[in-house]
Amino acid sequence: MESSAKRKMDPDNPDEGPSSKVPRPETPVTKATTFLQTMLRKEVNSQLSLGDPLFPELAEESLKTFERVTEDCNENPEKDVLAELGDILAQAVNHAGIDSSSTGPTLTTHSCSVSSAPLNKPTPTSVAVTNTPLPGASATPELSPRKKPRKTTRPFKVIIKPPVPPAPIMLPLIKQEDIKPEPDFTIQYRNKIIDTAGCIVISDSEEEQGEEVETRGATASSPSTGSGTPRVTSPTHPLSQMNHPPLPDPLGRPDEDSSSSSSSCSSASDSESESEEMKCSSGGGASVTSSHHGRGGFGGAASSSLLSCGHQSSGGASTGPRKKKSKRISELDNEKVRNIMKDKNTPFCTPNVQTRRGRVKIDEVSRMFRNTNRSLEYKNLPFTIPSMHQVLDEAIKACKTMQVNNKGIQIIYTRNHEVKSEVDAVRCRLGTMCNLALSTPFLMEHTMPVTHPPEVAQRTADACNEGVKAAWSLKELHTHQLCPRSSDYRNMIIHAATPVDLLGALNLCLPLMQKFPKQVMVRIFSTNQGGFMLPIYETAAKAYAVGQFEQPTETPPEDLDTLSLAIEAAIQDLRNKSQ
């Protein structure tokens, strides 16, 4: 059983024995390996000592060189191994792990050559065996082509090293200045080449398809090294395939005409001055060569896109991030009648009057309606302000009818900073109340005043007396060719669903009128029976009217207190009578 379990001898691989317990047969290669290790053991010990007292010193006579061993091969007991020194010795060197690149004379045989080139894997030194002997190769020191060692009596040095891995290929260091961008990394803005290494394009919209900035095939100029601005790495994809928003104007000018009363060209007087003739600059946007696909213009997408550029080498002023204006949602200033008339190419006449500071007379009122972006500015409200008692009395009369759907509160105030702060605080409190419809502050636009002649007034009165058909057929349209003007005071309306909410809103608004008697005005206005701003308030309005005729389901706390006092008084009277 044991003999069948043992491994058999492999004739192709004699180094492998039949079993780990059975000694392996000696082959010429193993004999040569044992001989080399025995010969080098003393050399290794002598190399380790190096004068160290811990290691015993070996006499030089006991050491033999390889040349001397070959000369005394007849006296050596291993002469049968040296006779076959050719191929066997080369294989023994490989098995012993000897590196031929070590110091000392190189072992060169007649029938073998050792190669120490690095391989892909860390394997021992490969041996290339050749059948033809190398010319001029000899193992004796006299015929060796290399230089003789200084001490021939000393044995040659053989250092056993592990295989050396292949050295990495060292590439030359490339400077950052030597890296040039591709030719299509260039943007032209106002006839200037912008270096894209200092630009970051950020977009959060998917509607910017077709908005591209044309790129030129020129090499981008590198920014100056002394500017102190960091370089930003350009994106990997070319800029010609990216969508860009319009570049902002370096002067920060708006894209469209601004007719807001809070514009920069404002005055502190109640009427106009000579400087009002100048129009506010409505400068156009940046001039960028663009290619349009599908939509026209840069303002086609309703999104916010930012273009943040670093300082350029030309020294141009940089602007901060700016929102791109939407085309679908326009600002309130663009909804003014004056701007709409300009868009429709309506011609405006310029009155032949002199503009000056001061109050406007009735016969010179036409100079107020010249073509300008200025608003009519007022420190105080230009009309008669009713008293608080009149406003409150009219509100109470409306509340007695139990329906206030045809009533509303109008607040008019100037744009003084202190007044605006107080009004905003009241608006914040109104927003927390129930059953209210609040408007945002808005402006009023005014047209040219005209006094109608008596015949026009007579025709209108007759049409009203005749009835609805005559009034419908009346055609009295009196026009003008002057530019409408807007006043700078703000307006706001409040619509309440029930009398409870109307009186509650008045309690918040009337203190403003009391604090600013010339800058804030509160009115009660009437409308037709059109209903509420939204139908959701109809249930609350009907419940208020019905609730006045229903009996309360619970006894008020005042009645309970009165009843308890009466019971206590009756009990006290009974006690007094019993005594």
Curated annotation (Swiss-Prot):
Which keywords belong to this entry? Answer: Activator, DNA-binding, Early protein, G0/G1 host cell cycle checkpoint dysregulation by virus, G1/S host cell cycle checkpoint dysregulation by virus, Host nucleus, Host-virus interaction, Isopeptide bond, Metal-binding, Modulation of host cell cycle by virus, Phosphoprotein, Transcription, Transcription regulation, Ubl conjugation
Q: Name one Pfam family in it.
A: Herpes_IE1
As one GO molecular function, the record gives: DNA binding
Its subcellular locations are: Host nucleus
* Gene Ontology terms: biological process: DNA-templated viral transcription; regulation of DNA-templated transcription; symbiont-mediated perturbation of host cell cycle G0/G1 transition checkpoint; symbiont-mediated perturbation of host cell cycle G1/S transition checkpoint
One Gene Ontology cellular component annotation held by this UniProt entry: host cell nucleus
Q: Does the keyword Phosphoprotein apply?
A: yes
Q: Motif SUMO-interacting motif 1/SIM1, which positions?
A: 199-202
Instruction: Name the segments for region: Disordered.
Output: 1-30, 99-161, 206-335
Going by the entry's taxonomy, the superkingdom of the source organism is recorded as Viruses
Annotated cross-link Glycyl lysine isopeptide (Lys-Gly) (interchain with G-Cter in SUMO) - which positions?
A: K175, K180
Instruction: Give the main localization category.
Output: host cell
- Sum up the protein's function in the record's words: Stimulates viral early and late gene expression and thus play a crucial role in the regulation of productive infection. Selectively drives host RNA Pol II transcription initiation at a subset of viral early-late and late promoters without substantially affecting Pol II transcription of expressed host genes. Mechanistically, forms a repressive complex at the major immediate-early promoter region involving direct association with host nucleosomes and TBP. Concerning activation, stimulates transcription by binding nearby, but not within, core promoter regions.
Q: What is known of its domains?
A: The SUMO-interacting motif (SIM) is required for efficient transactivation function.
Polar residues compositional bias, start-end: 99-133
Positions where Phosphoserine occurs in the chain: S203, S205
Give the quaternary structure.
Answer: Interacts with host SUMO-modified form of TATA-binding protein (TBP)-associated factor 12/TAF12 in a SIM-dependent manner; this interaction increases the transactivation activity of IE2. Interacts with host CHAF1A. Interacts with several components of the host transcriptional machinery including TBP, TF2B and CREB1. Interacts with host DNA replication licensing factor MCM3. Interacts with host PLSCR1; this interaction inhibits IE2 transactivating activity.
Q: Where is the composition biased (Basic and acidic residues)?
A: 1-11
Annotated stretches, region: Non-covalent SUMO1 binding region (SIM): 200-208
Q: Describe PTMs of this protein.
A: Phosphorylated by host CK2 at Ser-203 and Ser-205; leading to enhanced SUMOylation.
This protein's record includes keyword Acyltransferase: no
- Biased composition, Low complexity: where in the chain? 216-236, 259-270, 301-316
Q: Which organism is it from?
A: Human cytomegalovirus (strain Towne) (HHV-5)
Entry's family note: Belongs to the HHV-5 IE2 protein family.
Motif SUMO-interacting motif 1/SIM2: chain residues: 409-412
- Where in this protein would one find the motif SUMO-interacting motif 1/SIM3, according to its record? 500-503
Record protein name field: Viral transcription factor IE2
The encoding gene: UL122
